[in-house]
From Swiss-Prot:
Record keyword Zinc-finger present: yes
Keyword Repeat included in the entry's annotation: no
Stored CDD domains: TOPRIM_recR
Start and end residues, zinc fingers (C4-type): 57-72
Function: May play a role in DNA repair. It seems to be involved in an RecBC-independent recombinational process of DNA repair. It may act with RecF and RecO.
GO BP annotations, alphabetical order: DNA recombination; DNA repair
Alphabetic keyword roster: DNA damage, DNA recombination, DNA repair, Metal-binding, Zinc, Zinc-finger
Protein name: Recombination protein RecR
A single MF term (Gene Ontology): DNA binding
PROSITE patterns for this protein: RECR (PS01300), TOPRIM (PS50880)
Residue ranges of domain Toprim in the record: 80-175
Protein family per UniProt: Belongs to the RecR family.
Length: 200
């Protein structure tokens, strides 16, 4: 089917969203144009306002409308712990655990094949933040449990060890409520390697 230039432009714009292919973008565009024009207008306004008003926190680099995000602006947070994550979405996930320390958001993970080295993802800024703050006794490496995430955590841990700082890695393994027969071998091996005594 051939769409008019404006409809084609809308479909192509919607396709930049993760997980949205050609068919889904077409359905979204036609839904907005045929049945929910007020919703489309609200979406356009919200998107425009967010693109104009949302930037990065000057301390942790997560997304925020202020100079400091709510976590960095909160004086009650634990200044001895720094949690390093790959992206802003990970901050929201870690917050759900009740973690009360500070954050540093990388711009992804190390990926030499994609041209992403330490500078590209912000490791020099991370090390500068740790040195400037001077209060962190533990750096929690909460990068994703992928080959690249593990390599990134290992690289950062080596840099921290050279400075005499403690790095810890979040545990990986069997999900709570999961059944062993449904867990892949790599995940199960990681869980066995990271086993610990039961606290009584």
């Amino acid at each position: 089917m051939s769409f008019s230039p404006l409809i084609r432009q809308l479909i192509d714009a919607l396709r930049i969203l993760p997980g949205v292919g050609q068919k889904t973008a077409q359905r979204m565009a036609l839904q907005l144009l045929e049945r929910d024009r007020s919703g489309g207008t609200r979406l356009a306004q919200a998107l425009s306002q967010a693109m104009e008003g949302v930037g990065h926190c000057r301390q942790c680099r997560t997304l925020t409308e202020q100079e400091l995000c709510p976590q960095c602006a909160d004086p009650r947070r634990d200044d001895t712990q720094l949690c390093v994550v790959e992206g802003p979405v990970d901050v929201y996930a870690v917050e759900q655990t009740g973690y009360r320390g500070r954050y540093f958001v990388l711009k992804g993970h190390l990926s030499p094949l994609d041209g992403l080295g330490p500078e590209a993802i912000g490791i020099p800024q991370l090390m500068a933040r740790i040195e400037e703050q001077g209060t962190f006794s533990e750096v929690i490496l909460a990068t994703n449990p992928t080959v690249e995430g593990e390599a990134t955590a290992h690289y950062i841990a080596q840099l921290l060890a050279e400075k005499g700082l403690t790095a810890t890695r979040i545990a990986h393994g069997v999900p709570l409520g999961g059944e062993l027969e449904l867990v892949d071998g790599g995940t199960l091996a990681h869980a066995f390697a990271g086993r610990r005594p039961i606290a009584l």
